[in-house]
């Protein structure tokens, strides 16, 4: 546009200067900020979050009778499933509890390993 100057301040941050000298700052060229300026969360963290959301949606869809309209905390078994799905990306191998170990800490061998009230 004639008379307007666009300057890059840093990636995804631009100033637009109008002919009268007034300026505006435009972030992400007007796109969604959390996508265009995503510098806060690495992809691994986002993958965990999206996996939690996806498993929660599947749980709600396949078991609607267990979830009347309300707000729920993600069940521990699903949270632990997401963690297990991401172990390879960390180069981690997880062993299975022996029955006596599970009994000692008061959980089932297959989990979940934390009580429902526990918050990570």
From Swiss-Prot:
Its cofactor is NAD(+). One of its GO terms (biological process) is S-adenosylmethionine cycle. Its EC number is 3.13.2.1. NAD(+) binds at residue 34. Pathway: Amino-acid biosynthesis; L-homocysteine biosynthesis; L-homocysteine from S-adenosyl-L-homocysteine: step 1/1. May play a key role in the regulation of the intracellular concentration of adenosylhomocysteine. PANTHER family: ADENOSYLHOMOCYSTEINASE. This is Adenosylhomocysteinase. It comes from Streptomyces fradiae (Streptomyces roseoflavus). The lineage of its organism: Bacteria, Bacillati, Actinomycetota, Actinomycetes, Kitasatosporales.
């Amino acid at each position: 546009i004639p008379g307007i100057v666009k300057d890059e301040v840093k990636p995804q941050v631009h100033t637009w200067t109008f002919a009268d000298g007034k300026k505006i700052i435009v972030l992400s060229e007007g796109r969604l900020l959390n996508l265009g300026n995503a510098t806060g969360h690495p992809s691994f963290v986002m993958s965990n979050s999206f996996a939690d959301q996806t498993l929660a949606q599947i749980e709600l869809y396949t078991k609607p009778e267990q979830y009347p309209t309300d707000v729920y905390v993600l069940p521990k078994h699903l949270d632990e499933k997401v963690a297990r799905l991401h172990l390879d990306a960390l180069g981690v191998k997880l062993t299975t509890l022996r029955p006596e170990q599970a009994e000692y800490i008061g959980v089932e061998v297959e989990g979940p390993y934390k009580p429902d009230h526990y918050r990570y």
